[in-house]
């Protein structure tokens, strides 16, 4: 059992009614009057729906034991993404609604880890940084580095990130997958 005050983003727990929930955001909130509460943004792992809720810090939940296996992202069709276990070549289907954030960072044939809750496939874990190529951005303007505000760039997965002014189409960038931000040129 784990207390609500110990839950952090990325953790998965099971509610008393059997729902498998992943924490997207968690923060302590102390109202002017009353007791401290935990404000959380959560996702139902099975349905993909997200919701906001509050819990008392002492509320307890059953922490879900999630196992991972190495896999390769194959392709997506309709509303399903397909992955292959790289050890036993078994293929798995995951509804896109459950992993739409992760799909912004991975290309076909990328290495990931598939998450299992018992024998049920519930999601994927991606690397903390990925290398992606810029497919569209505004041209660099000489002397425009003074402002330092950057410009939007579209990457090969369709993700749009803010990049420095010197970045051009065709360059490979390192992207932080947790925040969806530019780190450096590759």
Curated annotation (Swiss-Prot):
Naturally occurring in which organism (per UniProt): Streptococcus mutans serotype c (strain ATCC 700610 / UA159)
Tell me the GO BP annotations in alphabetical order.
Answer: peptide biosynthetic process
Q: Which Gene3D superfamilies match?
A: 2.30.30.30, Nucleic acid-binding proteins
Give the function comment from the record: Involved in peptide bond synthesis. Stimulates efficient translation and peptide-bond synthesis on native or reconstituted 70S ribosomes in vitro. Probably functions indirectly by altering the affinity of the ribosome for aminoacyl-tRNA, thus increasing their reactivity as acceptors for peptidyl transferase.
Report the GO molecular function annotations. Answer: translation elongation factor activity
| Gene Ontology terms: cellular component | cytoplasm
- Tell me the Pfam families matching this sequence: EFP, EFP_N, Elong-fact-P_C
Q: Which PANTHER family match?
A: ELONGATION FACTOR P, ELONGATION FACTOR P (EF-P) FAMILY PROTEIN
List the subcellular locations: Cytoplasm
Q: What is this protein called?
A: Elongation factor P
């Amino acid at each position: 059992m784990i207390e609500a005050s110990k839950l952090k983003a990325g953790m998965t727990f099971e509610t008393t009614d059997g729902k498998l929930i992943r924490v997207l955001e968690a923060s302590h909130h102390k109202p002017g009057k009353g007791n401290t509460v935990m404000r959380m943004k959560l996702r139902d792992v099975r349905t993909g729906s997200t919701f906001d809720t509050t819990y008392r810090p002492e509320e307890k939940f059953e922490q879900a034991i999630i196992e991972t296996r190495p896999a390769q992202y194959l392709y997506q069709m309709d509303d399903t993404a397909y992955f292959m276990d790289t050890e036993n070549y078994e293929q798995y289907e995951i509804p896109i609604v459950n992993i739409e954030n992760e799909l912004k960072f991975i290309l076909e044939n990328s290495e990931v880890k598939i998450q299992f809750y018992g024998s049920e496939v519930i999601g994927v874990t991606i690397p903390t940084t990925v290398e992606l190529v810029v497919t569209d951005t505004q041209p660099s303007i000489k002397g425009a580095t003074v402002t330092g505000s950057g410009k939007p760039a579209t990457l090969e997965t369709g993700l749009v990130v803010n990049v420095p002014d010197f970045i051009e189409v065709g360059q490979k960038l390192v992207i932080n997958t947790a925040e969806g931000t530019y780190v450096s040129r590759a």
